[in-house]
From Swiss-Prot:
It holds the Pfam family TT_ORF2-like. Residues 191-200 have a biased composition (Polar residues). This is ORF2/4 protein. Residues 181-190 have a biased composition (Low complexity). It comes from Torque teno virus (isolate Human/Japan/TRM1/1999) (TTV). Residues 121-130 have a biased composition (Basic and acidic residues). The lineage of its organism: Viruses, Viruses incertae sedis, Anelloviridae, Torque teno virus. InterPro entries: HEV_TT_vir_Orf2/Gyrovir_Vp2_N.
Length: 290
């Protein structure tokens, strides 16, 4: 969508002239850009048309150039070079070599036979004892395989000492059935009537008497307390407490601070007369639930 220019002609000319001065200052150090431009205009004159383009080259981008053509495979194997002068000097020897004669000597003939045998020999492949070619995988651990005839012999079973100090060998597989314990178990399975009867467990209604029986401890006032001797004190039996002078000093110091009467027995809870009394609730009816 066309819009009217935001700047007038004078301001546009000033921007163009400023751009020329800035570009000249970026590439040249002379102080007069106008004189430099006039000198270039007189020397170079009007710009000529661009030269015609050359032959178009359709080169593939980001692609490797094609490899050169492979050389032609030779038909027959080149003859072995003859020992001696040029071919034209001894024509008779060359004729013998062309007809299958050994012009180079017996050593050269043996070497040619060895090379021909090596080329015609089939490539050998390493195979395992089952005929499967061994192809080690990269990063896999090598595992030793032995043919049945070369399998390593296992060590004999290690013995153990019996109760009498005699060494008894460990039996494996079918030999373990000949042990006395195994024979006794097999005989018991065959004759179920001869097995020992399992004793009957006592009924829960008549449990056996516990070895821990409670006993009564009578105080000086004649009241008795039921105490069970099955109770275990984690810190041991309590010892008689005999307060020292320091304990009584701390007791009277606490009485002065908390404004309470002293205790006769330091194990008794303290009494604070100024503390509010606990609310006592008395219920004169019973709640029945059905």
């Amino acid at each position: 969508m066309w819009t009217p220019p935001r700047n007038d002609q004078q301001y546009l000319n000033w921007q163009w002239y400023s751009s020329i001065l800035s570009s000249h200052a970026a590439m040249c150090g002379c102080p007069d850009a106008v004189a430099h431009f006039n000198h270039l205009a007189s020397v170079l004159r009007a710009p000529q048309n661009p030269p015609p383009p050359g032959p178009q080259r359709n080169l593939p981008l980001r692609r490797l150039p094609a490899l050169p053509a492979a050389p032609e495979a030779p038909g027959d194997r080149a003859p072995w070079p003859m020992a001696g002068g040029a071919e034209g000097e001894d024509g008779g020897a060359g004729g013998d070599a062309d007809h299958g004669g050994a012009a180079g000597g017996p050593e050269d003939a043996d070497l040619l036979d060895a090379v021909a045998a090596a080329e015609t020999r089939p490539q050998e492949t390493q195979e395992g004892h089952r005929g499967v070619p061994l192809q080690p995988r990269r990063g896999a651990k090598r595992k030793l395989t032995f043919p049945p005839s070369q399998a390593p012999q296992t060590s004999p079973p290690v013995g153990r000492l019996a109760a009498g100090g005699k060494r008894v060998a460990k039996l494996r597989g079918r030999d373990a059935d000949r042990l006395p314990a195994a024979q006794a178990a097999a005989a018991a399975t065959a004759n179920p009537g001869s097995q020992t009867q399992t004793p009957v467990q006592p009924s829960p209604k008549n449990p056996p008497k516990s070895r821990y029986q409670p006993y009564l401890v009578t105080k000086g006032g004649g009241s008795s307390i039921l105490i069970s001797n099955s109770t275990i004190n984690m810190f041991g039996d309590p010892k008689p407490y005999n307060p020292s002078s320091n304990d009584w000093k701390e007791e009277y110091e606490a009485c002065r601070i908390w404004d309470r009467p002293p205790r006769g027995n330091l194990r008794d809870p303290p009494f604070y007369p100024w503390a509010p009394k606990e609310n006592q609730y008395r219920v004169n009816f019973k709640l029945g639930f059905q």
